[in-house]
């Protein structure tokens, strides 16, 4: 952590190199929050008994998006939103397909586990090397993301027995996509003093803990995590 903090002091947040990388990373977090906003609205339709809670989560994601848009404006950076839409296209399409088929378990794994863990990992690694304005915004966001992760964990734990097979299939289909996403931004993340290995480690810790909380054994988690290597 100290090493990263020292690196942040050396970063020139106004340099064209940094701002170029930031235009894509900032777009990814903006689009990620927009995806989450829309996904929770869809989940509210699929889970009417949890409608109000899911709409509350969707509104929080929209608020997060506005915060990250302000981070871009603070550095005079225009986010590359087209890049970000393509970046999320794999998970986006899989979520839409699952929702159309009424596969709530798959939708929850994609949004409430994979996307939330991806976001938490990215924010955890970014905070020590962020500019002061973005650090304050991101610290506030990451605290709320844990509550979003918790919703998925609680629901899936309560329905674990009947959900396990679908969870395993959804994991196999979607975890490799995360690895491809991480590979895609490795260069830009490095420019911003965020190392891919640290992002992978934090993601796997968050994701493994979530799977454990749902009810998977340690052996199960190791097996499920190995599917990510397919996309490495």
From Swiss-Prot:
Binds 2 metal cations per subunit. The catalytic dinuclear metal-binding site could be either a di-iron or a manganese-iron cofactor. Fe cation 1 binds at residues 33, 61, 64. CDD domains: Ferritin_like (cd00657). Pfam families: Ald_deCOase. NCBIfam families: Ald_deCOase. Belongs to the aldehyde decarbonylase family. This is Aldehyde decarbonylase. It comes from Nostoc punctiforme (strain ATCC 29133 / PCC 73102).
């Amino acid at each position: 952590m100290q090493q990263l903090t020292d690196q942040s002091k050396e970063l020139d947040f106004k340099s064209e190199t940094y701002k170029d990388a930031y235009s894509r990373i900032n777009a990814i977090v903006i689009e990620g929050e927009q995806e989450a906003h829309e996904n929770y609205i869809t989940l509210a339709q699929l889970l009417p008994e949890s409608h109000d809670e899911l709409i509350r989560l969707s509104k929080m994601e929209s608020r997060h998006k506005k915060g990250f848009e302000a981070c871009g404006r603070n550095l005079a950076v225009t986010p590359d939103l087209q890049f970000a839409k393509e970046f999320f296209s794999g998970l986006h399409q899989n979520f839409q397909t699952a929702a159309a088929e009424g596969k709530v378990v798959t939708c929850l794994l994609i949004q409430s586990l994979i996307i939330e863990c991806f976001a938490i990992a990215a924010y955890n690694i970014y905070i020590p090397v962020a500019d002061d304005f973005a650090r304050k915004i991101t610290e506030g966001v990451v605290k709320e993301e844990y509550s979003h992760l918790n919703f998925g964990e609680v629901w899936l734990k309560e329905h674990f027995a009947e959900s396990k097979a679908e969870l395993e299939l959804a994991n196999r289909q979607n975890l490799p996509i995360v690895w491809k996403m991480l590979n895609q931004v490795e260069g830009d993340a490095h420019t911003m003093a965020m190392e891919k290995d640290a992002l992978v480690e934090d993601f796997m810790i968050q994701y493994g803990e979530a799977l454990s909380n749902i009810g998977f054994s340690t052996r199960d988690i190791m097996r499920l995590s190995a599917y990510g290597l397919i996309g490495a």
